[in-house]
């Protein structure tokens, strides 16, 4: 699916019956969350709330509420096509030596396609049609959702945060939630291992005492948003990747108050800085964030994060505010995980050819549990795969549980996975525990915030060297009998 910006994407979704306009007044305070949650659980359409209570700007919700719409956002027509994207990323991440002239030509064509998708910088852009500065900057003028009864304040959820480290050649794009704490202030909740936090940390060391510029794009086109949550190789910018998905170069414009480049077609852009504050150990302004209901289905504990002061807000004429909520699965992050799972598979297989399939169950809060199907070749092989998954992509840094099974187990069928665990696992021999590893700050089950343990479960058939006992043989009916019963089944009248 090809589109130019978020508005074009919305228009095409509506024509396909994948978006519904809501003309009834609906409050951003709790009501939108309940409506979007019910719609997502029913695999319903994206929703455009045209009359948010007390606001003039419409709200777009449930945009990525089905894997199919995620695929459409990534320029595909079906979820199955996402593996092609994974193959492209795998080639870029770990290119093998070309095997012949055809491979050389194919690789050259891919490189040219990526080069042709280098971002295009504009002198003016729709996102600068309207500019709020000074006292006009007031977040209360935006229909920011208050998602759950126990949330401390309204929360910006789909903001595309744009940062740049002092020694980095390109910008980083990330999705980080932002708590509203004032007319022009939000708390930027980014984990220490994420790109935005790393950029800021580098700035605070190299340029301590100087304000750190940030831009937040709300309502960027889907390819750019999804590029920020996809394992794009370091050699490729998210803007280039978005252009590759979209089939057209990503158009950027220089922010009005910094050297950062923002998506030209973004609906709303927040520009500002994290300002120095020598009273804080970091040397920069911080505040206590939370609690908020999150993708685990619980309210998280409070913690300190940097304060982003918004100096100006720019927007398109008649802007659209893109929002979401996070809660007990399924929610949009869980749906994204299901779709991006297809992108991850070729990447993993490129590095570990023994991996046959890979699955992130949506009930596992997007990434906390993974099930791997492998072609086992030697004793201890499953353990190697576990550590490979944990270390290969940053997306799996926080995966707490990995279950590894043989090729005869359908990893997308929990009945088969549970059967493999209960019949092929000895709890002492086949579980691997690793302590003091990075864990999501939102994971309150870990003993220390941001640091906890991981478990690997080897549910494969055991080889000599792993057991001294005669291993069980699975029960299967002969093909001849199955064929015979198929032939007489209708006559049996069962």
UniProtKB/Swiss-Prot annotation:
Keywords: Cell membrane, Decarboxylase, Flavoprotein, FMN, Lyase, Manganese, Membrane, Metal-binding, Ubiquinone biosynthesis. The keyword Manganese applies. One of its GO terms (cellular component) is cytosol. It is a peripheral membrane protein. It comes from the Bacteria. Its cofactor is prenylated FMN; Mn(2+). It is found in: Cell membrane. GO terms for molecular function: 3-octaprenyl-4-hydroxybenzoate carboxy-lyase activity; metal ion binding. Pathway: Cofactor biosynthesis; ubiquinone biosynthesis. Pfam families: UbiD (PF01977), UbiD_C (PF20696), UbiD_N (PF20695). Its EC number is 4.1.1.98. Its main location: membrane. It catalyses: a 4-hydroxy-3-(all-trans-polyprenyl)benzoate + H(+) = a 2-(all-trans-polyprenyl)phenol + CO2. The keyword Ion transport does not apply. GO terms for biological process: ubiquinone biosynthetic process. Binds 1 prenylated FMN per subunit. Catalyzes the decarboxylation of 3-octaprenyl-4-hydroxy benzoate to 2-octaprenylphenol, an intermediate step in ubiquinone biosynthesis. Belongs to the UbiD family. This is 3-octaprenyl-4-hydroxybenzoate carboxy-lyase. The lineage of its organism: Bacteria, Pseudomonadati, Pseudomonadota, Betaproteobacteria, Burkholderiales. The gene is ubiD.
């Amino acid at each position: 699916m090809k589109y130019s910006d978020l508005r074009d994407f919305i228009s095409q979704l509506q024509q396909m019956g994948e978006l519904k306009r809501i003309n009834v007044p609906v409050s951003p305070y709790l009501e939108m969350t309940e409506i979007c949650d019910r719609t997502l659980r029913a695999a319903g359409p994206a929703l455009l709330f045209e009359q948010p209570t007390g606001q003039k700007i419409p709200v777009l919700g449930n945009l990525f509420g089905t894997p199919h719409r995620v695929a459409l956002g990534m320029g595909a027509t079906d979820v199955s096509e996402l593996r092609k994207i994974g193959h492209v990323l795998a080639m870029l991440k770990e290119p093998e030596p070309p095997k012949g002239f055809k491979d050389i030509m194919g690789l050259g064509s891919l490189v040219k396609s990526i080069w042709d998708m280098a971002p295009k910088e504009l002198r003016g852009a729709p996102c600068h049609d309207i500019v709020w500065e000074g006292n006009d900057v007031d977040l209360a003028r935006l229909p920011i959702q208050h998602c759950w009864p126990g949330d401390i304040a309204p929360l910006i959820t789909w903001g595309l945060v744009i940062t740049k480290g002092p020694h980095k050649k390109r910008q980083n794009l990330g999705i980080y939630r932002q708590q509203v704490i004032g007319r022009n202030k939000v708390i930027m909740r980014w984990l220490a291992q994420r790109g935005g936090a790393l950029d800021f940390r580098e700035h605070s060391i190299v340029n301590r005492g100087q304000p750190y510029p940030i831009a937040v794009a709300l309502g960027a086109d889907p390819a750019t948003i999804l590029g920020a949550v996809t394992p794009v190789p370091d050699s490729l910018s998210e803007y280039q990747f978005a252009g590759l998905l979209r089939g057209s170069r990503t158009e950027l414009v220089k922010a009005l108050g910094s050297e950062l480049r923002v998506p030209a077609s973004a609906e709303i852009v927040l520009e500002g800085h994290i300002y120095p504050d020598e009273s804080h150990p970091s040397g920069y302004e911080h505040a206590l964030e939370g609690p908020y209901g999150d993708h685990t289905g619980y309210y998280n504990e409070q913690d300190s994060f940097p304060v982003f002061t918004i100096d100006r807000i720019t927007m398109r004429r008649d802007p659209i505010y893109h929002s979401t909520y996070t809660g007990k699965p399924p929610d949009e992050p869980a749906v994204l995980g299901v779709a991006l799972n297809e992108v991850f598979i070729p990447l993993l297989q490129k590095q570990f050819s023994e991996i046959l399939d890979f699955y992130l169950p949506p009930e596992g809060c997007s990434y906390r549990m993974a099930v791997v199907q492998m072609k086992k070749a030697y004793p201890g092989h499953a353990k190697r795969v576990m550590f490979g998954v944990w270390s290969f992509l940053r997306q799996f840094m926080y995966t707490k549980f990995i279950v590894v099974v043989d090729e005869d187990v359908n990893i997308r069928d929990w009945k088969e996975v549970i059967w493999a665990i209960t019949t092929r696992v000895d709890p002492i021999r086949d579980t691997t525990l690793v302590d003091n590893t990075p864990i999501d700050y939102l994971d309150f089950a870990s003993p220390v915030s941001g640091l906890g343990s991981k478990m690997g479960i080897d549910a494969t058939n055991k080889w000599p060297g792993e057991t001294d006992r005669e291993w069980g043989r699975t029960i299967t009916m002969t093909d001849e009998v199955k064929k015979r019963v198929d032939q007489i089944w209708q006559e049996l009248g069962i």
